[in-house]
């Protein structure tokens, strides 16, 4: 899970990409919700914002504007 705009968002489905990067862990590195983590990248596929239904990434991004380079916590 991560927090964004004071809301908890659960990651329900994701893919780990074993790829080198220079970003701080937690940094959003693309507009498709790819998150830098440790020594790879987490590509989020499905998530659920608190008190809302589960959405695939395309549905979520239609209603939520998270900017690239945002550091998620």
From Swiss-Prot:
<dbReference type="Pfam" id="PF02911">
    <property type="entry name" value="Formyl_trans_C"/>
</dbReference>
<protein>
    <recommendedName>
        <fullName>Methionyl-tRNA formyltransferase</fullName>
        <ecNumber>2.1.2.9</ecNumber>
    </recommendedName>
</protein>
<comment type="function">
    <text>Attaches a formyl group to the free amino group of methionyl-tRNA(fMet). The formyl group appears to play a dual role in the initiator identity of N-formylmethionyl-tRNA by promoting its recognition by IF2 and preventing the misappropriation of this tRNA by the elongation apparatus.</text>
</comment>
<comment type="similarity">
    <text>Belongs to the Fmt family.</text>
</comment>
<keyword id="KW-0648">Protein biosynthesis</keyword>
<dbReference type="InterPro" id="IPR037022">
    <property type="entry name" value="Formyl_trans_C_sf"/>
</dbReference>
<dbReference type="InterPro" id="IPR011034">
    <property type="entry name" value="Formyl_transferase-like_C_sf"/>
</dbReference>
<dbReference type="InterPro" id="IPR044135">
    <property type="entry name" value="Met-tRNA-FMT_C"/>
</dbReference>
<dbReference type="InterPro" id="IPR005793">
    <property type="entry name" value="Formyl_trans_C"/>
</dbReference>
<dbReference type="GO" id="GO:0004479">
    <property type="term" value="F:methionyl-tRNA formyltransferase activity"/>
</dbReference>
<keyword id="KW-0808">Transferase</keyword>
């Amino acid at each position: 899970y991560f927090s964004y705009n004071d809301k908890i968002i659960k990651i329900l489905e994701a893919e780990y990409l074993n790829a080198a990067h220079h970003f701080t862990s937690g940094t959003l590195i693309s507009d498709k919700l790819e998150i830098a983590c440790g020594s790879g990248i987490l590509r989020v596929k499905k998530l659920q914002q608190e008190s809302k239904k589960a959405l695939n990434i395309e549905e979520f991004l239609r209603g939520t504007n998270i900017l690239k380079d945002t550091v998620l916590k």
